[in-house]
Swiss-Prot record:
PROSITE patterns: K_BOX (PS51297), MADS_BOX_1 (PS00350), MADS_BOX_2 (PS50066). PANTHER family: SERUM RESPONSE FACTOR HOMOLOG (PTHR48019). It holds the Pfam family K-box. It comes from the Eukaryota. This is Agamous-like MADS-box protein AGL9 homolog. The gene is TDR5. Residues 89-179 form the K-box domain. It is found in: Nucleus. Transmembrane segments: none annotated. One of its GO terms (cellular component) is nucleus. GO terms for biological process: positive regulation of transcription by RNA polymerase II; regulation of transcription by RNA polymerase II. It comes from Solanum lycopersicum (Tomato). GO terms for molecular function: DNA-binding transcription factor activity, RNA polymerase II-specific; protein dimerization activity; RNA polymerase II cis-regulatory region sequence-specific DNA binding.
Amino acid sequence: MGRGRVELKRIEGKINRQVTFAKRRNGLLKKAYELSVLCDAEVALIIFSNRGKLYEFCSSSSMLKTLERYQKCNYGAPEPNISTREALEISSQQEYLKLKGRYEALQRSQRNLLGEDLGPLNSKELESLERQLDMSLKQIRSTRTQLMLDQLTDYQRKEHALNEANRTLKQRLMEGSQLNLQCSQMHKLWAMAGKQLKLRAMASFILWIVNLLCKLGIRMIQLQ
């Protein structure tokens, strides 16, 4: 049973794509070298990766000479009147036209997303536009929901912090009230103690006066 035909399409995985590129590139360069050696052919191979890196092989001493030979055989000799500056101007003009086309396409897409200029669109384009709008709405809803959840979490955190601060303040106020009560009781005790000391001092003084008067009275009686 023969091998089935493999469908050629772009490899989606970036790593797999790079690995496949490296293997196929090396194989292609090897085949070009073998062809030039086995058949004594002049072979030139130019490869640019998707990142713009150049890989080349040339069986002759100069890639430029091989390219000039290729141009003579297929396109004729290059026009001598076209200077490097003119070539750059042409390249810049082409790049400008590409950018202009992309800009106009983006403008049309933006107008279509806003519901404008829908007349020229066919059914498939309208379906694609509808899918884009649905995806945009889903993304907007998801972003809005996440924003509301973040705000709710922030409010809960602030509420918890305020409750903690309120409890701490109440505890300090209670401690302050108890301290004031203790201080008031201490003042009362000191006041009572002071009064008692004063009364004792006055009682001692009065007793001393009474004793003194008694002694004086006894002497006066004796003198009489």
